Amino acid sequence: MVTLYGYKRVLKDDLPTSDWKKQLWKDGIGAIDEHLNGFQQWGLPPSDNPYVWPASRHAWALNEVQRFFIEETRLGIPTDFTNEGIRGVESYIATNFPTQLGLGHTWNRNLVHKVGYITGREGRLLGYTNVYAPILDVGRDQRWGRYEEVYGESPYLVAELGIEMAKGMQTDHQVAATSKHYIAYSNNKGGREGMARVDPQMSPREVEMIHVYPWKRVIKEAGILGVMSSYNDYDGFPIQSSYYWLTTRLRGEFGFRGYVVSDSDAVEYLFSKHGTAADMKESVLQSVLAGLNIRCTFRSPDSYVLPLRELIAEGAIPMSTIDDRVRDILRVKFLVGLFDHPYQIDLKETDKEVNCAENQQVALQASKESLVLLKNQDAVLPLDVNKISKIAVCGPNADEEAYALTHYGPLAVEVTTVLEGIRNKVKPGTNVFFTKGCDLVDANWPESELIRYPLTAEEQSEIDKAVENAKKSDVTVVVLGGSNRTCGENKSRSSLDLPGRQLDLLQAVVATGKPVVLILINGRPLSINWADKYVPAILEAWYPGSQGGTAIADALFGDYNPGGKLTVTFPKTVGQIPFNFPTKPNAQVDGGRNKGLDGNMSRVNGPLYPFGYGLSYTTFEYSDISIQPAIVTQVQPVTVRCKVTNTGKRAGDEVVQLYVRDILSSVTTYEKNLVGFDRIHLNPGETKELTFTIEPRDLQLLNSDNHWVVEPGDFKVMVGASSEDIRLNDRFTVVEYGKEQAVTSATSQQQKSVIASSSQESVPLVLDGNLSTAWKANKGEYITFALENNASPNSIAIAWKEKSKDAKFEIQLSGGGGQFLTVYEGTVEATNELKNYRFKGTTASDIRIVITSGNASISEVKIKELKN
């Protein structure tokens, strides 16, 4: 029930020794974390870790450790080797992907699935059976240090990509995917870490709508086998000791069947930081009773095992509870095959496949698809390699590798920097002038974010060198942003501006009058207002992985057309925070329209770049939206179709985004909710039709009784290139199923099989054989006819008496359960005589006529399969 941190973390030995048999923890180890992965011994290679590489030697060493637990312990239960893996498995060398924020900006489910598969496959080949990914935190505060680890701000997008990552990782149960950090972890007060990440700022409804949503879906749809409990409290109750969150919700409501591992030292934090337990023993008691299976810590496992034994002996923790906790762990170990195949046998395959060329191609694709073009004034990009004889490159991230080798992924792979990528791309004989220009941060940082210090002579000299290079070049590429110095765990910021002297460098280079392209390599959105106004071209690369330099150079010179879209919001200033997507109506604007001395505007409004935004070297046109059915019940999906055409001269990718809004609701809902997306590739002139399905869950709200419901009414559908660039829109209507009033006044038994949404007293008139009487209906209203058993209708005869000019209708069939499928759409023709409408027949229990536009009246209906 404990984790033992591996070599040079807590464990002192690389391979088993005779001393291991004397250790208290030998019979209680659930997992060994990060063993021999090289995290504590960065270097080329680490001198004191002979088992870090090659891959086969590493796998052999983990086999030997596993052999000890199987052959030398009382029960012979294999251990679960765990490791990090949000941008590739954290080994000395493995396939290196962009960080998770970059992967989010691909909007590519299939690609993320491949990343997950490679991460899990390489993890298992190296000997690991449990990988800590994906991250299901939802980005809400751009200052937060771990923003680089989220997929984005939309809970729907986090869920969709999290599902694919987890499914890929757990292919054939090659590893267990352990998601983190459960729950309400990513909205700390002020964006601060606070070590225990205490006091998240959100309402209960927001927790459910934003933060619980991805977990619920990923657990149900991907079946993740691991969950890491988070440090933080919510509403004063630490998640680590919460039976409500770890058992009632996680296991009871969501159906989680794996095991829960604590974040490192989270158990200790109950008494050392939260103050909700008196000591370690009480912390252990609270955690185990709440639902914790395995405790993770940077200390010896004895500190947990000893108080746990005391609590069991005292009867404070029943053996039935221990059995439950151990059963979960064993279930996961059985599922990943540890009892059948505990050793990695094919060591030659390990060397052949880990970080192989095929996997690196997937990583390069991910690096390319994560790029977002933020600005391209006058089509500065792409650069023409044939017209450039001199190019200047500067900036602290131009020749930097560290952003590709941060924690939670591969540690020592070869990295292609932006400078190297450019040098590899330009034609022979092209002069590439490089100078760094400035450091990532200055000597007074982070205080320099509050107080402006004058440039030192040395700083001015470095900027002057960059200016001289720019003056003699055709174009200058400035590579700025952040690194693990400014972003990462415990690296929250008080500003979103470019740190250090980076803006000074950029302004000086732009002042030369030569063309400038800004490349951003960073782990969070930045407030680059000056750059947006004065720099002609800006490309956001996030942390693009070890092949980021190649991907960026391909985009700069037109061998690749960037097509990523923002999954986050770029505020104009830190003073706007919280500023994110989705948002409630008018929640992110202030009053006042007139600027200046005589105006009434007191605050800057709007984002610098909104959620979903991103440019391309080509253009796209949207057309032909259709919604089917236009009238649905609360349990019925809606199909939305549209067409997108590449109207430019280059092939390119477009991320088509589907949003929905509940127009009238019992509680305030979000202005737009992302409910669908698709990344498509189009050649010049090519058109593709896209099909989206809006599921009932996408329309749900948490009502005043804290029940998830789909409320009847109109919903607005929006299809666009971003959350603020809506190209197409339409509506559909949800009607309440089961509330129709059955007709009881009819004179025939047949008429009792008819129900309607309105004008119940007139319903019998459609079956009375009299064309002078009619049932009248407006848009959204319908009449439903029950059919005889095993009916398979393919036609219905309708006599329309009156109609408005815009009257349209649908014929729908249902197999039961309230879901109806549209089989015919048409325009009402008021001839007052029966007209036969034919459609493709299928087995159905009910047939429905729905008025989808305007109003109309029906005088008679004939259905040969009508139930008697």
Segments predicted by a language model, with ranges:
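Short solvent-exposed strand-capping/beta-turn motif centered on an Asx-Ser/Thr pair
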Residues: 645-651, 788-790, 801-803, 854
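Short strand-edge motifs at loop-to-beta-strand transitions and within beta-strands
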Residues: 678, 686-692, 781-785, 833-837
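Short beta-strand elements
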Residues: 726-738
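Short coil-to-beta strand junction motifs in C2/discoidin
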Residues: 652-656, 709-711, 803-810
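Glycoside hydrolase catalytic-domain context in secreted enzymes
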Residues: 1-700, 712-719, 723
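Trp- and acidic/polar-enriched beta-sheet ligand-binding modules for extracellular glycan
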Residues: 803-867
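Beta-strand-rich interaction surfaces with strong enrichment in secreted/lumenal proteins
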Residues: 676-682, 706, 772-775, 824-827, ...
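Disordered, acidic Ser/Thr/Pro-rich linker "stalks" and the adjacent N-terminal cap
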Residues: 737-793, 799-805, 829, 833, ...
